[in-house]
UniProtKB/Swiss-Prot annotation:
Pfam family, one: HTH_18
GO molecular function: DNA-binding transcription factor activity; transcription cis-regulatory region binding
Protein name per the record: Uncharacterized HTH-type transcriptional regulator Mb1430
Residue ranges of every copy of the HTH araC/xylS-type domain listed in the record: 242-343
Assigned keywords, A-Z: DNA-binding, Transcription, Transcription regulation
Gene3D superfamilies reported in the protein's UniProt record: Homeodomain-like
PROSITE patterns membership: HTH_ARAC_FAMILY_2
GO cellular component entries: cytosol
Entries under InterPro entries matching the protein: AraC-type_N (IPR032687), Homeodomain-like_sf (IPR009057), HTH_AraC (IPR018060), Tscrpt_reg_AraC-type_HTH (IPR020449)
Residues in the DNA-binding region annotation: 263-284, 310-333
SMART domains assigned: HTH_ARAC
SUPFAM superfamilies referenced in this protein's UniProt entry, alphabetically: Homeodomain-like
């Protein structure tokens, strides 16, 4: 349950990026610096209908982390500001669910309407349930941020209506978290769960199965059905929005570091290059922008996770000069690739 599609194909509401920029501004980093190297415009942050690509979200997070390498808990700061009302009809659907089981089912069905990057899996036995949050599919350098953000976001958005249920089963619930205890403790004080182990390699919550099917206090079947119908409409609209951009992204990310040319992609899509260029422009992007997005994502992986040198990464990504790659990398992340690599 809850396994995510490839990041290149995922799109989320703009709300989380707006909060990210708010946190950045408070810490002295301008919005323009956070969004540089992405297809997100500052004006998009105030558009309630805007959606952003997950890869652009990851790029924005990387830029902020690169600017603030010594700031701990940025993910928790962002996630703790989330509110279900900011997610529109999906948020109201969640608040109207009859049980935690129904809530998780709805969340997975409309996962694209959330801002979550972590993968959620449910395991059940006759008496117990275990929910695991996993970020292993994300690039290593941003996993910690998204684990922090999404755990904090879950706590912040569900406490108001799930608190009575959590209090009833407090002595039967336990959690194992990879998050730093001191950073998360202020949020956990809002939740009546006392058995929490920090510093683990995974993020799991154990609770009795009876709790999963216990009625929630704000359940409203009529509101839920109305919101579900509208969520279906939103999902269909977002699917149509993916269009040709998602297809081109999938071609670029097919073989990490070996990027096809524009002509190659047009040929694979059985489309004249002029037609492909026009279709991408209609969706507000270009092959050059998408190639830059792919290169920026792969560059970080090759530097940090594969351990290649700056020269090797430059060659692998198709640059003829290391200086050209270094200039592009600094434009994407605000620091030189050599400095980024040293930070590990």
């Amino acid at each position: 349950m809850g396994h995510l599609p490839p990041p290149a194909e995922v799109r989320h509401p703009v709300y989380a990026t707006r909060v990210l920029c708010e946190v950045a501004n408070e810490r002295g980093v301008p919005t323009a610096d956070v969004l540089a190297g992405t297809a997100i415009e500052p004006a998009d942050l105030d558009d309630p209908d805007a959606v952003v690509g997950a890869l652009d979200e990851i790029t924005a997070v990387r830029r902020l982390l690169a600017r603030l390498p010594d700031d701990a808990g940025i993910g928790i700061d962002v996630g703790s500001r989330f509110a279900l009302t900011h997610f529109g009809l999906f948020g109201f659907a969640v608040m109207s669910c009859g049980t935690l089981r129904e809530l998780l089912t709805i969340a997975m069905r409309y996962f694209a309407l959330t801002t979550m990057h972590v993968d959620i899996t449910l395991f059940e036995t006759a008496d117990d349930c275990l929910v695991e949050l996993d970020a292993s599919h994300l690039p290593a350098d941003v996993r910690g941020f998204f684990i922090e953000r999404d755990i904090a976001g879950i706590i912040a958005t569900t406490t108001s209506f799930a608190l009575p249920l959590a209090a009833k089963y407090a002595d039967q619930v336990s959690a194992e978290l990879a998050v730093d205890a001191e950073l998360l403790r202020p949020l956990l004080e809002l939740v009546p769960v006392h058995d929490v182990a920090f510093g683990r390699a995974h993020n799991r919550v154990h609770f009795p199965r009876a709790m999963f099917d216990e009625p929630l206090p704000q359940a409203d079947r009529h509101t839920l059905e109305m919101c579900i119908a509208q969520c279906d409409v939103l999902m269909q609209r977002n699917e149509r929005r993916r269009g040709i951009t998602a297809l081109v992204r999938s071609k670029l990310f097919r073989d990490s570091g070996l990027f096809p040319t524009f002509t190659d992609v047009a040929g694979e899509l059985d489309m004249h290059p002029r037609t492909l260029r026009r279709r991408l422009a209609e969706e507000g992007t270009s092959f050059r922008a998408l190639l830059g997005e792919a290169r920026s994502t792969v560059a970080v992986d090759l530097l940090r996770n594969v351990g290649l040198t700056v020269q090797q990464v430059s060659t692998r990504l198709g640059y003829t000069e290391v200086s050209t790659f270094s200039h592009a990398f600094k434009r994407w992340y605000g620091v030189a690739p050599s400095e980024y690599s040293r930070r590990g």
